[in-house]
Amino acid sequence: MDPYKYRPSSAYNTPFCTTNSGAPIWNNTAVMSVGERGPILLEDYQLIEKIATFTRERIPERVVHARGASAKGFFEVTHDVSDLSCADFLRAPGVQTPVIVRFSTVIHERVSPETVRDPRGFAVKFYTREGNFDLVGNNFPVFFVRDAMQFPDVIRAFKPNPKSHLQESWRFLDFCSYHPESLLSFAWFYDDVGIPINYRHMEGFGVQAYSLINKAGKARLVKFHWKPTCGVKSMLEEEAIRVGGSNHSHATQDLYESIAAGNFPEWRLYIQTIDYEDQNNYDFEPLDTTIAWPEDVVPLRPVGRLVLNKNIDNFFAENEMLAFSMSLVPGIHYSDDKMLQARSFAYADTQRHRLGPNYLQLPVNAPKCPHHNNHHEGFMNFMHRDEEVNYFPSRYDACRHAEKYPMPPNVLSGKRERCVIPKENHNFKQAGDRYRSWAPDRQERFVNRFVEALSDSKVTHEVRNIWISYWTQADRSLGQKIASRMNARPNM
């Protein structure tokens, strides 16, 4: 469907305003009343329609990633990866695919400043010839918890206090004190990269492990990495306070104005891959979202480039109604990553809540390739259909099964149970390695930020001691520094 054909504001270039039903309006500045000073008439359909439309303009904001900005462009394959995936949009170097990208903060509300310390979202929708592929990630390569059952809780812990609506560090420090696997995420969160200078200078990571399948049916685990060609840049607290105090939409403005000026943001896509049969040969768990795949063990491989060269035409239509739902295409599949599998339900479900069951009919979300199924009717269904057969199979309809494409061939066995990921030996190691890789001044800023969080008056001695113990296990000198600032003794 061509979205521009149905725009009531300019589709037919009418010289005057009309009602939603198309009737001409001869006075759009005064209500219908009994005389000049009399009461308004209930029959003033024009007023009722105008007010009713206004009071319904807002839709539910996203439960996470509410604050965001979008832009359009293309993805181009630059390196041959046909040995890894049979995905059509990755078939050969030079192939271009239209995309729309949404950047966001994670925790804060729709109108919050873009200078807050918060993970950033980096979501890409590829409009491929075989359907849409949604690659939804963050600017950190890891997450705070490894099991999907804990996802709602960690988000609530970072959200404002439900009683006061104040965001308080004691809440997420309390929750994450039960999760030492969160250390590496905190080593990103309280690092300098915790406040990107804008969206153009921000990395992106798929976080979870997906699966790539080639034409021969060989499957590999894969992680995706977006690297900005203009480099990674961040803001320190003083600059964030100054910038946020004068412009709470600085990153959105920077993205929009850069594209308008022809300074198109660009990222390079890299992947890491692990053969399915080699998953258990590493000392880390490849399906654990709280750890990173070491690049010296699993090297990066270049794939392509992402260029954003067009601003969106309407913020509501192409940002607020833009919906990512973990869509897949042949050649790319989910892995057994517990967080990824839960997200495959959560993303689509929250879009049904925000936008209705037919959210994929909205122009920004609809595939650009031919598509057909028997998903009929429902709220806000605006697709015109005149077929008589809405079931499958039928001898009156030529629709048939598509050609079979390869799927991950893993064979599963085990008993039904609730259990934890067994390999937890990297809870502390990678966080310590990251801390030790920083220059002394960067280490000092990290210590100051974490000590400030621990200094919340509602953080108990027990929680403080737990965190000092965690950081001591990551790096003894780091634990000692935090303990010294808190007038406590580090315990192993």
Curated annotation (Swiss-Prot):
<dbReference type="GO" id="GO:0042744">
    <property type="term" value="P:hydrogen peroxide catabolic process"/>
</dbReference>
<dbReference type="InterPro" id="IPR024708">
    <property type="entry name" value="Catalase_AS"/>
</dbReference>
<dbReference type="GO" id="GO:0020037">
    <property type="term" value="F:heme binding"/>
</dbReference>
<keyword id="KW-0560">Oxidoreductase</keyword>
<feature type="active site">
    <location>
        <position position="65"/>
    </location>
</feature>
<protein>
    <recommendedName>
        <fullName>Catalase isozyme 2</fullName>
        <ecNumber>1.11.1.6</ecNumber>
    </recommendedName>
</protein>
<feature type="active site">
    <location>
        <position position="138"/>
    </location>
</feature>
<keyword id="KW-0376">Hydrogen peroxide</keyword>
<keyword id="KW-0349">Heme</keyword>
<dbReference type="InterPro" id="IPR020835">
    <property type="entry name" value="Catalase_sf"/>
</dbReference>
<comment type="similarity">
    <text>Belongs to the catalase family.</text>
</comment>
<keyword id="KW-0408">Iron</keyword>
<dbReference type="GO" id="GO:0042542">
    <property type="term" value="P:response to hydrogen peroxide"/>
</dbReference>
<dbReference type="GO" id="GO:0005886">
    <property type="term" value="C:plasma membrane"/>
</dbReference>
<keyword id="KW-0575">Peroxidase</keyword>
<dbReference type="InterPro" id="IPR024711">
    <property type="entry name" value="Catalase_clade1/3"/>
</dbReference>
<dbReference type="InterPro" id="IPR018028">
    <property type="entry name" value="Catalase"/>
</dbReference>
<dbReference type="Pfam" id="PF06628">
    <property type="entry name" value="Catalase-rel"/>
</dbReference>
<dbReference type="GO" id="GO:0004096">
    <property type="term" value="F:catalase activity"/>
</dbReference>
<dbReference type="GO" id="GO:0005777">
    <property type="term" value="C:peroxisome"/>
</dbReference>
<dbReference type="InterPro" id="IPR010582">
    <property type="entry name" value="Catalase_immune_responsive"/>
</dbReference>
<feature type="binding site" description="axial binding residue">
    <location>
        <position position="347"/>
    </location>
    <ligand>
        <name>heme</name>
    </ligand>
</feature>
<dbReference type="Pfam" id="PF00199">
    <property type="entry name" value="Catalase"/>
</dbReference>
<comment type="subunit">
    <text>Homotetramer.</text>
</comment>
<dbReference type="InterPro" id="IPR011614">
    <property type="entry name" value="Catalase_core"/>
</dbReference>
<dbReference type="InterPro" id="IPR002226">
    <property type="entry name" value="Catalase_haem_BS"/>
</dbReference>
<dbReference type="GO" id="GO:0046872">
    <property type="term" value="F:metal ion binding"/>
</dbReference>
<comment type="function">
    <text>Occurs in almost all aerobically respiring organisms and serves to protect cells from the toxic effects of hydrogen peroxide.</text>
</comment>
<keyword id="KW-0576">Peroxisome</keyword>
<keyword id="KW-0479">Metal-binding</keyword>
